[in-house]
Design a protein with these regions (language model features):
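Cleft-lining beta-strand/loop regions that shape enzyme active-site pockets
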Residues: 213, 229, 254, 367, ...
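Conserved PDZ fold ligand-binding element
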Residues: 224, 228-232, 249-250, 362, ...
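PDZ/PDZ-like peptide-tail recognition elements
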Residues: 191-198, 401-457, 542-551
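Extracellular and organelle-lumenal recognition/adhesion modules and their flexible linkers in secreted
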Residues: 20-192
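Cationic-aromatic interfacial patches
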Residues: 200-202, 220-340
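Amphipathic alpha-helical substructures
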Residues: 234-267, 370-415
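PDZ/PDZ-like domain segments forming the peptide/carboxylate-binding groove
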Residues: 213-214, 219-222, 226-227, 294-331, ...
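Bacterial Sec-dependent N-terminal signal peptides
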Residues: 1-24
Length: 742
């Protein structure tokens, strides 16, 4: 539900390299400066939305005039920015502690230090301390258990979630109260999978144009390889590097002239991995509460695979008792944690073998651990023959990133995008953008706001102008072109993201627009600026410095969750006590979690509001429904409540809306929401590509899904072009009318 929190988790992924030097460098006083980066040594690794945050050193801005590092938001669209100091060693001990000083300014989300111990479940990002707004220097401490048998790296840093600015300084990390810089690292105990480095420098596979049979062979290999990865006990124990095993078997499968030869090559490989012992306690899964059953594709289809291979795979299926798996774990709430996957981030343009690994890895994660696979809209197996040739044909980093983007977009999940700074994809989109906002209104691309008052943009383009062509390309043709590359759950959300990601981007700063203004065609030239310099905040939330609640005409309470804080709830209750109703403007991402704080204040009735589906390590591909959740009503507020939603309402906003809907006095108006709810799971792919998926299925108590469809809407209300030109907020006006009974 909390998308921002999981964005924060997304980039703090497993790092498996061990440095040769034995001296621990934390440099928490920031005094040792790297000559190239001009940043403190060991503190030049950034995570999160790098384009939307500034990372700087203030040489005297810290506690008592000491050096401090800064994270500052540049736009309203950033989810989080973080510094990551990696200590690539393990130590003897039982407790780890991070201490440091932190100061904040106008933080809308939350800020804090973070600490993660790779190889274990130990993680804390101080979200529960709810540090936001403006705060003076204060020392903070994170204390976690330290499992020296399984710990790999220590990742320490500071983060800013949402908008604002933070300073931090005087960072120290202790093991059993001894600074790590005074400790001697212990020799790490590696899994056998980590010791197999045979292909760490590349596969040596040359590019080739696959025949139809080679595509079929590779598709079959992908399915068997993933099945083995998530079912064979030897793999689950961490004894097999499945990336390396793919590269070992792939050449013989590519050479196979037909399915029979491909089956023989795959069977020989399976035999080398070993047969599992007979499992006397293994049994078929219970059919109770099953939301989605495992799908094994073609691997048991005897018109595709040989009988002997099918029998061996069937034996593995029914003789594994994997309660844990080296490559997959389940978070406490039930979403998948794809452990021990290597990002190979130094391979910006991976060779053909690693490009296929990216496809195979992602395909099997979706096949076995995506709760909404049945909502994708096509047979997931059909993706392989379509994308195998594209991944093989990618001639450079740009084409590889674009192929990966098409793959990721094919699951139709608004959480699924390329969230890392993929330079190839950035080059494809173009670094320049015009300094105005445009949205699809009444199926037309309409100028709706200005990001920057620069380069004569307000003279060239007016609010309400309809853009029909960009640099000679018709908008409707551009939409068709970029739909397969726009990762979103539904068409409305694809149109939400497409202007910023593709339509209003170019490698050239000179833009030419065909425009309809009051029905008259015009051609307008507009110079663009670097996309990273656009002030998205000015358009997305013009009132970002104001409180998240106020009175409207002394009759209606208004709450904007993007600026709401739970500490304000007592003041809100007092201010709203005599109002006729409350408008909750959910066309944003909530800055704090509201379902069990604000919702009880307005709720009446006993209705439950949500249930989840989650996956299984023991039965990969199986998803079960969990128990329904309930918000206990305070029943303090007696007026009407109207929640406004649109395509900007995503993840936590959708979950919060569902909680509101469990109250009988709530009406939801607006338009289709983003259709991406549930805790997210991070995925890394070769080339350092970072993405994620919705890791839990989210349903109303009656079983109605929200993925792709969005939340239920009682009354559809959309902006019009005429309303945009007149400066009206038509959904807000309708919400007022509902409360006042007009």
């Amino acid at each position: 539900m909390n998308l921002r929190n999981f964005f924060v988790l997304l980039f703090l992924f497993f790092l498996s390299d061990y440095a040769a030097a034995q001296s621990v460098v934390l440099n928490g006083d920031f005094k040792k400066i790297d000559a190239a980066s001009k940043l403190p040594v060991a503190w030049d690794n950034f995570m999160g939305d790098k384009a939307n945050y500034d990372f700087k050193l203030d040489s005297a801005g810290g506690q008592n005039g000491k050096p401090a590092l800064i994270i500052a938001s540049k736009t309203t669209d950033g989810n989080f920015g973080a510094y990551d100091c990696v200590i690539p060693y393990t130590f003897k001990g039982h407790e780890i502690k991070l201490k440091g000083y932190l100061k904040t300014e106008n933080v809308t989300g939350y800020a804090g230090f973070w600490l993660r111990i790779d190889g274990t479940a130990s993680f804390n990002n101080m979200q529960d301390q709810n540090i936001h707004g403006t705060t003076d220097w204060k020392e903070y401490t994170i204390t976690l258990p330290y499992d020296d048998k399984n710990a790999v790296n220590i990742n320490a840093g500071a983060l800013l979630s949402g908008k604002g600015k933070i300073w931090f300084s005087d960072v120290q990390v202790y093991i059993d109260d001894t600074p790590v810089e005074k400790l001697k690292p212990k020799t790490p105990e590696l899994f056998n999978a980590q010791k197999d480095m045979a292909f760490s420098q590349g596969t040596g596979m040359v590019d080739f144009v696959p025949t139809d049979q080679q595509i079929k062979n590779l598709a079959l290999l992908c399915q068997v390889w993933g099945f083995i990865k998530y079912h064979l006990p030897k793999v689950a124990a961490g004894d097999v590097n499945m990336d390396a095993e793919l590269f070992r078997v792939m050449p013989s499968v590519i050479k196979a002239k037909n399915y029979a030869e491909a089956s023989a090559a795959i069977e020989q490989w399976v035999d080398k991995l070993g047969k599992p012992a007979v499992c006397s306690i293994c049994k078929p899964f219970d059919e109770k509460d099953v939301a989605q059953k495992p799908d094994y594709g073609e691997i048991f289809d005897r018109s595709v695979v040989s009988a002997s291979l099918a029998d061996k795979l069937n034996f593995i299926l029914h003789n594994n008792d994997n309660r844990q798996n080296y490559y997959i774990a389940m978070a406490q709430v039930g979403n998948p944690d794809f452990s021990h996957e290597l990002p190979y981030k130094e391979m910006l343009y991976p060779d053909a073998g690693y490009r296929l690994l990216a496809l195979f890895r992602y395909w099997n994660m979706i096949q076995y651990f995506f709760p909404d696979k049945y909502l994708i809209g096509e047979d997931w197996s059909n993706v392989l023959p379509r994308l195998i040739p594209k991944f093989l044909a990618a001639k450079n980093a740009m084409e590889y990133d674009v192929a990966a983007m098409e793959m990721i977009a094919s699951v139709h999940d608004t959480h699924a995008n390329i969230w890392s700074a993929a330079q190839g994809l950035s080059d494809y989109r173009g670094k320049y953008a015009p300094p105005f906002q445009a949205k699809f209104i009444e199926n037309k691309l309409v100028v709706t706001a200005y990001y920057n008052d620069t380069l004569g943009v307000k003279d060239n383009l007016r609010i309400g102008d309809i853009i029909t062509a960009i640099n000679g390309a018709k908008v409707e043709e551009m939409v068709k072109k970029f739909l397969p590359l726009t990762a979103a759950s539904n068409y409305e959300t694809q149109l939400r993201d497409m202007p910023r990601e593709y339509l209003l981007r170019s490698g050239n700063a000179d833009f030419e627009f065909d425009v309809l203004r009051d029905g008259k065609p015009l051609q307008v030239k507009q110079t663009g600026i670097a996309q990273t310099k656009l002030n998205y905040l000015a358009a997305a939330d013009p009132h970002h410095n104001e409180p998240g609640y106020h009175l409207m005409d002394n009759q209606i309470g208004y709450v904007y969750p993007g600026r709401y804080h739970n500490k304000d709830l007592p003041a809100i209750k007092e201010l709203f006590k005599d109002t006729k109703g409350i408008i909750v403007d959910m066309r944003c991402y909530p800055s704090e979690f509201m379902p069990f704080t604000f919702v009880p204040y307005i709720k009446n009735g006993e209705a439950k509001f949500v249930k989840f589906t989650s996956g299984s390590i023991y039965y990969p591909g199986l998803f079960r429904e969990g128990q329904e959740l309930y918000v206990k009503p305070d029943n303090k507020y007696k007026g009407k409540v109207v929640v406004i939603v649109n395509e900007e309402s995503q993840s936590q906003a959708e979950y919060t809306t569902m909680a509101f809907q469990s109250s009988t006095n709530v009406t939801v108006i607006g338009s289709t929401t983003a259709g991406a709810d549930g805790n997210v799971s991070a995925i890394v792919l070769p080339g350092g590509i970072s993405t994620m998926i919705s890791g839990l299925g989210v349903l109303y108590p009656d079983g109605t899904v929200t993925q792709r469809k969005g939340v239920r809407i009682d009354e559809v209300v959309k902006p019009t072009i005429a309303g945009i030109k007149a400066g009206k907020d038509e959904p807000l006006e309708r919400a007022e009318a509902i409360i006042l009974g007009k």
